[in-house]
């Protein structure tokens, strides 16, 4: 039997997913069922745009519910670690110096489900995170970028 992949989540990410699931199941699912019933009352369903739209929304909601349930059935919380021996791990906030543009960037290393570049949350599977994982402050690493490799130096790690 194939081993199921564990989804890495922070405690905050777990709470967000649980809240989203409750909203979808308790509120949005009921709302869309009501919309479908109202559209059915309009008569002929073959050319009923409201019905088609409500069914498409229902499909999206059910797909997301299934996706979240799968995540919640196969997750692992990112554990707190000994802060004396600071190394880059999943869950850490890391400030790096990018030598290609001489700028500093701060990222939080998270699991793929929580990654959101707009919030500076990058997946531990991303090229930057892969390059700096398990390194200490002051150490450098080569990131295998899309266009070319580049060097970064770890300035600060907050666990």
Curated annotation (Swiss-Prot):
Gene3D superfamilies, alphabetized: Transcription elongation factor, GreA/GreB, C-terminal domain (3.10.50.30), Transcription elongation factor, GreA/GreB, N-terminal domain (1.10.287.180)
UniProt entry keywords in alphabetical sequence: DNA-binding, Transcription, Transcription regulation
GO molecular function, one term: DNA binding
InterPro entries referenced in this protein's UniProt entry, alphabetically: GreA/GreB_C_sf, TF_GreA/GreB_CS, Tscrpt_elong_fac_GreA, Tscrpt_elong_fac_GreA/B, Tscrpt_elong_fac_GreA/B_C, Tscrpt_elong_fac_GreA/B_fam, Tscrpt_elong_fac_GreA/B_N, Tscrpt_elong_fac_GreA/B_N_sf
Pfam families, A to Z: GreA_GreB, GreA_GreB_N
Function: Necessary for efficient RNA polymerase transcription elongation past template-encoded arresting sites. The arresting sites in DNA have the property of trapping a certain fraction of elongating RNA polymerases that pass through, resulting in locked ternary complexes. Cleavage of the nascent transcript by cleavage factors such as GreA or GreB allows the resumption of elongation from the new 3'terminus. GreA releases sequences of 2 to 3 nucleotides.
Protein name (record): Transcription elongation factor GreA
Organism of this sequence: Mycoplasmoides gallisepticum (strain R(low / passage 15 / clone 2))
């Amino acid at each position: 039997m194939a081993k199921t992949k564990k989804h890495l989540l922070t405690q905050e990410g777990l709470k967000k997913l649980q809240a989203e699931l409750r909203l979808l199941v308790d509120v949005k699912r009921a709302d869309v069922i009501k919309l479908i019933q109202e559209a059915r009352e309009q008569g002929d369903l073959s050319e009923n745009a409201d019905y088609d739209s409500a069914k498409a929304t229902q499909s999206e909601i059910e797909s997301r519910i299934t996706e979240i349930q799968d995540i919640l059935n196969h997750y692992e919380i990112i554990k707190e670690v000994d802060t004396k021996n600071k190394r880059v791990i999943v869950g850490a906030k890391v400030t790096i110096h990018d030598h290609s543009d001489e700028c500093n960037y701060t990222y939080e290393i998270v699991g793929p489900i929580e990654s959101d570049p707009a919030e500076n949350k990058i997946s531990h599977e991303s090229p930057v995170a892969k390059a700096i994982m398990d390194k200490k402050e002051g150490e450098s690493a080569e990131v295998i970028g899309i266009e070319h490799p580049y060097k970064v130096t770890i300035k600060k790690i907050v666990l």
